A protein has these predicted regions:
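Short, Lys/Arg-enriched N-terminal segments with co-localized hydrophobic residues
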Residues: 1-19
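Short, surface-exposed loop/strand segments
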Residues: 58
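Positively charged n-region of N-terminal signal peptides that target proteins for export
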Residues: 17-25, 29
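C-terminal motif of bacterial Sec signal peptides marking the signal peptidase cleavage site
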Residues: 34-37
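A cross-kingdom marker for long, charged
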Residues: 274-346
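A generic local structural motif
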Residues: 21, 91-93, 292-293
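Structured, acidic catalytic/metal-binding patches in enzyme active sites
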Residues: 46-55, 63-279
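Bacterial lipoprotein signal-peptidase II cleavage site
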Residues: 39-46
Length: 346
């Protein structure tokens, strides 16, 4: 019997911020979340960094690093984001101080601005619309079972038959997130971007919405269909819920060991390994090179910045960390100590 391998927990490779934009593309942004602390430090001067700061009681100690360039005076903080969270998710003062001291923040895309840009939304969703075929034709014999399951769980939409299977899988991801007790409204992007907008901190998108939607629409069809197949049936959904709960717990405690052991796919378990490798290169390899290039360019210019991208981008090889180290930079982990229970983030 094959032992179930720990996978990156969602059918859409952790792109939960994109899930909600797909399903509620004109939804209002919810920004209510408690943030620990409110102190600010003088801008335009690198911070003195503690590698084991105290995190206020109740705060998450999520994956966090810093990389500096002594020759230029640059200091860039790197936060691993979680695209969904809980209403009581709180970020520690050492994270907020780093954000407020930065000249800019850099997410994959500005999800807050995207939520209010209806023209861009309409442009982006077109990348997920099928051309010359229907979802029923692509899904084939599993179509009726899939539709019935989606209807039963309240995630069916009449427009789905004209959308790529990835869109369907994203709908199922929203079900997983909900069953895991999480909400994308409280994900890292919405929380920190709302704060940045409120405080007038410059926002620099590393990719942007259109680039992400274009990529999602071009995922190999065999990968989209296999991903969707794992989103049908209570056993599949419940397994994803358990993985998602584990993911959130590991993220909350900066659990290096957990993330280092995650896999995106197993060549022995997929129908077309070459398509899955193409997907991996699209989702991770190519994007992480762009992220690393963005960071190294900022370091060479002596900038103070705050980058937050999906946590797996710091672990899936060639990771952002590996690429920065290949350029001669040292990336230092900042592991918060939880004040409430004395736990050191693993």
């Amino acid at each position: 019997m094959r032992t179930r391998q720990r996978r990156a927990p969602t059918a859409t490779a952790g792109l939960w911020s994109k899930t909600m934009k797909l399903l509620k593309i004109v939804a209002a942004v919810l920004s209510a979340v408690m943030l620990c602390g409110c102190a600010t430090a003088p801008k335009n001067q690198p911070l003195e960094v503690s590698t084991a700061p105290i995190a206020e009681k109740g705060c998450v100690t999520s994956p966090f690093w810093v990389v500096e360039d002594e020759s230029t005076g640059a200091q860039i903080f790197l936060l691993g984001s979680m695209h969904a969270g809980k209403a009581d998710t709180q970020y520690p003062e050492y994270v907020l101080e780093a954000l407020r001291n930065s000249s800019w923040v850099a997410p994959e895309m500005d999800t807050v601005a995207f939520a209010g840009d209806f023209i861009l939304q309409q442009k982006c969703v077109k990348y997920l619309v099928l051309s010359g075929t229907t979802a029923k034709e692509l899904i084939g014999s599993a179509y009726d079972e899939t539709v019935d399951y989606f209807r039963k769980n309240g995630i069916w939409q009449d427009a789905m038959d004209s959308m790529v299977p990835f869109y369907w899988a994203s709908a199922a991801s929203s079900l997983v997130v909900d069953k895991a007790g999480l909400d994308t409204s409280y994900g890292t992007e919405n929380v920190l971007l709302t704060l940045a907008h409120q405080e007038g901190i410059k926002i620099r998108e590393i990719e942007g919405g259109e680039a992400q939607y274009r990529m999602m629409g071009s995922i190999p069809m065999s990968v989209q269909l296999e991903t969707l197949a794992q989103c049908v049936g209570d056993d599949n959904i419940n397994a994803q819920v358990r993985d998602t709960e584990e993911l959130f717990e590991a993220w909350s405690r900066f659990d290096d060991d957990y993330f280092s052991k995650l896999t995106v796919f197993d060549t022995a378990e997929v129908t077309n390994p070459s398509d899955w490798q193409e997907y991996y290169d699209m989702m991770y390899t190519d994007r992480q090179q762009k992220m690393a290039d963005f960071i190294t360019d900022s370091l060479s210019k002596g900038e103070l910045g705050f980058v937050f991208v999906g946590t797996m981008h710091y672990y899936a090889e060639p990771s952002v960390m590996t690429l920065l180290e290949q350029e001669g930079y040292t990336v230092t982990a900042i592991r918060g100590i939880s004040a409430g229970d004395g736990l050191i983030a693993a």
